[in-house]
């Protein structure tokens, strides 16, 4: 490992030397070897959700939000209506995407520390039969709250509606089985729990829905139907692919399998989260969420109630000790966030806790 700080963020995150070294090779975007690399990545991604029988994996250049916008724009018909479930900033982003795309939508918003319930969704769908799709965030990255995906998905299926899942911060670490959870689209990205680098999103699109989506898209570049059709025909991307990102993700997926796949990745992140929560509690810092709805991905902490605490100063001091934290993203209270993901283990998390404790002493922050 270099002397670069450890990124305790929800992505981009700290990657392994092997993953970074995979980007030292240049690839021809139309070359057969690169096409095989793309196909291998998509095959491995589908295997994580046991989705090869029911879904296509459609990769897309750009951040995860590019892929979310592409999924909504491609799969929601122009006369469709989306019910957007919100309990944080990324749910708000789903609604903004629908608005910009001109898709009819309604929203249901709960407090930032309250998961949406299946009963909420049941009531909302019963009251509005015009809804065609429901969009939700699985793990809301602004807090780390985990929404009850399985229960909500069953309600949506019972009402005959279609589910779009933003699984950006959960895919690869939390179990999602396409054979058990009915969804039309699930979206994730290269630079999160798979421990690749940012630059590629991907959409698991239900096969029949994708086949029926021709002409829906608002954009040429974000047309997932066209993207998939071209890849299926030629093995190639329509437009210049992020070759180095894909090579890094391929290497990261090899390491994912070597570690033990999803169960092992989940366990390491859960151990990281426990170390973080226990350590921060020991120095008096309170987590924002109760344990039963806290995902082991990113943890939000209340900022110290002391005039000597200023986040910018705190951040720079912790960075000088080797750790990059994340600012809070809540609307009502001052917080900061610490990620549990990336190439880091419990020992690294304890070192981060020790750094935070040292910094608070240096700042003479007493009222925690």
Curated annotation (Swiss-Prot):
It comes from the Bacteria. It catalyses: (2-aminoethyl)phosphonate + pyruvate = phosphonoacetaldehyde + L-alanine. Keywords: Aminotransferase, Pyridoxal phosphate, Pyruvate, Transferase. Its cofactor is pyridoxal 5'-phosphate. The modification N6-(pyridoxal phosphate)lysine is found at residue 192. Its EC number is 2.6.1.37. NCBIfam families: PhnW-AepZ, PRK13479.1, transamin_PhnW. This is 2-aminoethylphosphonate--pyruvate transaminase. The gene is phnW.
């Amino acid at each position: 490992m270099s002397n670069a700080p450890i990124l305790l963020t929800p992505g981009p995150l700290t990657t392994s030397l092997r993953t970074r070294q995979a980007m030292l090779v240049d690839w021809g975007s139309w070359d057969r070897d690169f096409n095989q690399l793309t196909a291998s990545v998509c095959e491995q991604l589908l295997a994580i959700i046991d989705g090869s029988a029911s879904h296509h994996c459609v990769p897309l250049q750009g951040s995860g939000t590019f892929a979310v916008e592409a999924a909504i724009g491609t799969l929601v018909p122009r006369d469709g209506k989306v019910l957007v479930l919100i309990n944080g900033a990324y749910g708000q982003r789903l609604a903004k995407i629908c608005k910009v795309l001109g898709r009819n939508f309604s929203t249901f918003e709960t407090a930032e520390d309250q998961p949406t319930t299946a009963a909420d969704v049941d009531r909302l769908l019963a009251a509005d039969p015009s809804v065609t799709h429901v969009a939700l965030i699985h793990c809301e990255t602004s807090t780390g709250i985990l929404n009850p995906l399985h229960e909500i998905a069953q309600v949506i299926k019972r009402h005959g509606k279609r589910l779009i899942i933003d699984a950006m911060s959960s895919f690869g670490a939390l179990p999602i089985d396409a054979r058990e959870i009915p969804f039309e689209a699930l979206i994730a990205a290269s630079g999160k729990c798979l421990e690749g680098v940012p630059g590629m999103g991907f959409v698991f699109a239900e096969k029949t829905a994708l086949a029926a989506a021709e002409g829906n898209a608002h954009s040429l570049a974000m047309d997932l139907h066209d993207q998939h059709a071209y890849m299926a025909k030629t093995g190639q991307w329509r437009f210049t692919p992020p070759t180095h990102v894909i090579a890094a993700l391929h290497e990261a997926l090899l390491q994912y399998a070597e570690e033990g796949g999803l169960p092992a990745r989940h366990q390491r992140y859960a151990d990281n989260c426990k170390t973080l929560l226990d350590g921060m509690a020991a120095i008096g810092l309170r987590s924002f969420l109760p344990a039963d709805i806290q995902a082991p991905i990113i943890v939000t902490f209340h900022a110290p109630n002391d005039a000597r605490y200023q986040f910018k100063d705190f951040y720079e001091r912790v960075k000088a000790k080797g750790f990059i934290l994340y600012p809070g993203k809540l609307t009502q209270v001052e917080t900061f966030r610490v990620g549990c993901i990336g190439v880091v283990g419990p020992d690294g998390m304890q070192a981060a806790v020790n750094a935070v404790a040292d910094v608070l002493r240096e700042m003479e922050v007493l009222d925690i």
